[in-house]
UniProtKB/Swiss-Prot annotation:
Residues 414-429 have a biased composition (Basic and acidic residues). One of its GO terms (molecular function) is protein serine kinase activity. Coiled coil: none annotated. ATP binds at L13, G14, R15, G16, S17, F18, A19, T20, V21, K36. This is Serine/threonine-protein kinase ATG1. Its EC number is 2.7.11.1. Belongs to the protein kinase superfamily. Ser/Thr protein kinase family. APG1/unc-51/ULK1 subfamily. Residues 7-299 form the Protein kinase domain. The gene is ATG1. Homodimer. Forms a ternary complex with ATG13 and ATG17. It comes from Yarrowia lipolytica (strain CLIB 122 / E 150) (Yeast). Residues 369-380, 478-498 have a biased composition (Low complexity). The active site is at D150. It comes from the Eukaryota. Serine/threonine protein kinase involved in the cytoplasm to vacuole transport (Cvt) and found to be essential in autophagy, where it is required for the formation of autophagosomes. Involved in the clearance of protein aggregates which cannot be efficiently cleared by the proteasome. Required for selective autophagic degradation of the nucleus (nucleophagy) as well as for mitophagy which contributes to regulate mitochondrial quantity and quality by eliminating the mitochondria to a basal level to fulfill cellular energy requirements and preventing excess ROS production.
Amino acid sequence: MSSIKSYTIGNELGRGSFATVYKGEHVASGSPVAIKSVLRAKLNRKLLENLGSEISILKQMKHPHVVELLDFQETPTHFHLVMEYCSLGDLSFFLKKKKELSETLPLVASLLRRYPSNTRGLHEELVRHFVHQLSAALEFLRQKNLVHRDIKPQNLLLCPPSLSEMDAQNANLYGRWELPILKIADFGFARILPASALAETLCGSPLYMAPEILRYEKYNAKADLWSVGAVTYEMVVGKPPFKANNYVELLKTIEQSNDVIGFGREPPSEDMQDFVRCLLKKNPADRIGFKEYFEHPIIANKQVIGSGEELDRSQLDPRMYISEYIQEADLPKLDLDREMDSFSQKRSTQKSSPKNSTNKTLSSTVKNPLLELTSPSPGSSLLLTRKNESLFLESEYVVVEKRQVEVNTLADELAREPDERRPSSERRFSLTYGAPTGAMARALSMASARLLGEKKNGAGHGSGNGSRNGSGNGSGNGARLSAGAALSGTSSGTSTTGKSPPVPATTTPSLSEREIVETLEEIAAKARSIALLADVKYSQIQDDVDNPDMNLPDSVSSSIAEEAMLLYVKTLSLLSLAMDQAGAWWSNNHKDNKMVSSHFNEIIQWTRSAFNESLERAETVKKKVSSGTTHTTAEKLIFDRALEMSRDAAVQEISGDFTGCESAYTTSIWMLEALLEDDEDGLGEEDRRIVERFISSITKRLVILRGQQE
């Protein structure tokens, strides 16, 4: 048994992506505690900020219905948050396992006998009790101008009931004294939000997330009220009010409901139905405010109500965790960070070829990490198929080698072209904002076209074609794009090849060549944005020989390696697409001995270099991937990171860092545009629409930003 100062660390209670919670014990008093241990090496700047926010907020929290932070300790490898121990687990576990618990724990059995339910949910009196306690905590947060932003059943923890009505009154508890005590936990996403303020961040759990957040609109503390409505509905009915496989379907389901909320064959009281419906209004302006909320008949009386009879506390050991009352084989581990909840964590074990993958979504279709690359069909570049026997880069598969040979052959042929046959460039190329013929200007042009519903004519390489007229929307500010800085927080970034892909020269090539050059630049920019994300993950799993204790655990390293591998495969797919198009154009024009610009050659050489390095790194990270079912897709990784970058950009914009936020906005647009490239295993129509919607939303912010700088 390990320990930290004043505490011993016992069995694991639950595990998430960034933290593990253990049952602990205070050495001097023997009191049980929960110890949330966070591995330092897994935290980037944003996660450190969230952890710091949680700690600072919890230090202020002294309320009977808020989980208390008892102590905070740091070691060279971990942060340890010593929390109040809630032995009955979380509300989600209780709802799902109440039948099994009633068979092994008399407390739960007597509770359900006293308050039987005709639905998969809970008896209405029990729901009211929990809602009273949740509302008391919410009112406390409101007084401190705090919005939780992640209210969900997994963050509502339960403790055994008070021993007496007097004890409940002395502790200032709400609800019925003889029933379990509910407490709000996990303030990692919480923030100070004055009543007049609006936030622009997307966080929390989608199934309980307000639609204004799903729509990536500004929101205020009313978002918490939606979450309370969703949680209350689940307690009453036994399932969330809206279910979906991804963000797209979830938002679509909410919007199509038109605020019509059904409760099934066993509806609760009219008051309860009205309460939930007042909260689950898709338009926040139609949703009740906090004044009306606290005045609603369901909430009005939150004080302790004595029903007189204590529940059966026999066999209840305050030191035992709820899971210990059920056979271990039947118990899944408590998941601490279900930000995507059930729809984003679905596992797909069905094996199918890409040709059958017509409805792949951003988050629900999960590929096996054991992949191989198959011969690309026209226009589809590298396609992925599932294969249990081998990893996709095993040496016996000659497809990748064949693609590498083809890429290098074309690049070598162009490299041998005499310099005198190429028009010279007046300057070296860099990926900049403001240049009317630049790739960034066309990114804004593409996004603006989506925003206005216009169609752009392109070379047919995918749905993300840019403007071919070279006009763009450049303001001439010349602010240099640093996607690496936006991704990694450094002052300057490096691409897969250590430099930016080239962008147009000041000389104007012939129309046909200009078209192919612009097409290649766009694909290169998309590939570069994905490669940068892969490179960040690549750097995270490099072993530190001098400090082996700082290396990530194998399971964590394998997971990150798997993500890097998927991203490098996506990068290779885009780069291969670029070379396919370049090769086709070169074949048609070289026979006429037409002169080509040096810029055409430069972008081919950059693409070749990026392809080779991405392939090499993919082979490296592949060695760290353990066998088993993958937990994500490249599409989801790219989608999530693009939204995270745009959210960070909004924060930078508020702080006045216009160059930094412009970089983040434009890079996120490129990443989302990369998702729209057509291939046989591409996005479904619904997913394409949601990606286009986010591109339009981010473009609005970018246009406003540039307007402010002019």
